[in-house]
Amino acid sequence: MLKNDDTIVAIATPSGYGAIAVIRISGNNSIKIIKKIFCSFSKNQIETNYIHLGYIKYKKQIIDKVLIFLFKKPKSYTGEDIVEISCHGSIYIQNKLLSIIIDQGARLANPGEFTLRAFLNGKIDLCQAESILDIVNSETFFSHKFAINQMRGNISLLIRKLSKEIINLLSLIEFELDFSEENCNFINYLEFKKMLYNIIKKLKTLIRSFKIGNALKNGISVSIIGCPNVGKSTLFNKLLKYERSIVSNIAGTTRNYIEDSLIINGIKFRFIDTAGINNNTKDYIEKLGIKKTYSKINKSDLILYVFDDLNEKFILKKVKSLQEKYPKKKIFIIINKYDLIKKKIKEFNYKKIFKISAKYGYGVNNLLSEITFFSKKITSLKENTIVITQTRHYESFKKAIFYLYKVKKNLYSISPEFLSIDIRTALDYLGKVTGEVTNEDILSNIFSKFCIGK
């Protein structure tokens, strides 16, 4: 069992110097500890739900002038007694206060342990716990919006409704089992299949939402690819509006991919400058770079295929070859160095082709507008749509659907006892999302990603 009966302490604010810092204590002895070291200016009893001004004193020495906040269980973040100390942001003061509180019987918290205790004490479910980390890490309007919705319990509520529907299916099967000796069928199998189909349909909608949710949370991946020395790095820098990648007229300068982000209209884009594709190279390092390029292409939402000439047959051959290898990928053809090309484009048999000069910026804004427009098509959502952003949830929902499909397939061919096992397994996978069914390994993996003070 996970132990949570002692008192923990941690610095809750980012490390380093600052105007203020916050130190958080949680556990049965947190208020007892603060009463030993805090001298209130008001000389009154330290009460909960009030802010108190005073000194932290230790061995007759004043350490700092602080504000303290007391939260009595169960009305606190962790469901335990909590004290938060707001002190000056000196590194010495922070470490000294931490040391004093540990001397008084607390121990240093593990990463995410405050939120873990909130989960163990029933203040939040596992889905909401993950959303807190997402809120802390949110960089854009949409990543913040999804995290807030998850924290409010929107996904948890939907899972509870789906679980209830699955329990109804299970009840029908169990009822059939209870009266199996009567040689009577109590299940209306047509109605049962209809209920099963509706549950699967809702789960599939959640699974489909993951592509959108993941893109909006982690960023839309845009890989810039092409032969060596066609201007990929120059375009990469121009899109980011600063010199992020080394630019040289020597072919093969970029041996590894370089990635950086840009936020446009609340959406995060992850632009990736890749190694030039030279299938004839004998250079081992260059081959490794090209291998990574193809790996990035496979994971990209959009590919910018850069060329620096107008050989239509060559270009379409290259694009067709890539499209055959990655049939679901969206590809934009980029004709770079257009200012140097004497033969101008009249017609070109491809939907998305952009004439640019990455060096001088010609056509880059138009390209950026099209990239933004593309993002809207893959991220368009109806108002109040529930979207999943966690890979863990996605995998659990896929497993739940797998077992429900087994029930659908075997409905008329196997004993209700075996159908019951598959339905229970599907129910368990939904329970894993909210933490109703879990183990210590899952909890450790989730909460280890938090900072120590959270």
UniProtKB/Swiss-Prot annotation:
Top-level taxon in the UniProt lineage: Bacteria
PROSITE patterns named among the record's database cross-references? G_TRME
Q: Which residues form the TrmE-type G domain?
A: 219-376
What are the GO cellular component annotations?
Answer: cytosol
Q: Which GO terms describe its molecular function?
A: GTP binding; GTPase activity; metal ion binding
In terms of Pfam families, this protein maps to: MMR_HSR1 (PF01926), MnmE_helical (PF12631), TrmE_N (PF10396)
Localization terms from the record? Cytoplasm
Q: What is its EC number?
A: 3.6.-.-
Instruction: Report the co-factor binding details.
Output: Binds 1 potassium ion per subunit.
Q: Give the required cofactors.
A: K(+)
Q: Which UniProt keywords apply?
A: Cytoplasm, GTP-binding, Hydrolase, Magnesium, Metal-binding, Nucleotide-binding, Potassium, tRNA processing
Where would you say this protein principally sits, based on its record?
A: cytoplasm
Q: Which residues bind Mg(2+)?
A: 233, 254
SUPFAM superfamilies recorded: Folate-binding domain, P-loop containing nucleoside triphosphate hydrolases, TrmE connector domain
Please give the family membership noted in the entry. Answer: Belongs to the TRAFAC class TrmE-Era-EngA-EngB-Septin-like GTPase superfamily. TrmE GTPase family.
Q: Which HAMAP family match?
A: GTPase_MnmE (MF_00379)
Instruction: Tell me, in a sentence or two, what this protein's role is.
Output: Exhibits a very high intrinsic GTPase hydrolysis rate. Involved in the addition of a carboxymethylaminomethyl (cmnm) group at the wobble position (U34) of certain tRNAs, forming tRNA-cmnm(5)s(2)U34.
Q: How does it assemble?
A: Homodimer. Heterotetramer of two MnmE and two MnmG subunits.
Q: Which NCBIfam families match?
A: mnmE_trmE_thdF, PRK05291.1-3, small_GTP
What is the protein's given name?
tRNA modification GTPase MnmE
Q: Which species is the source of this protein?
A: Karelsulcia muelleri (strain GWSS)
What is the name of the gene encoding this protein?
mnmE
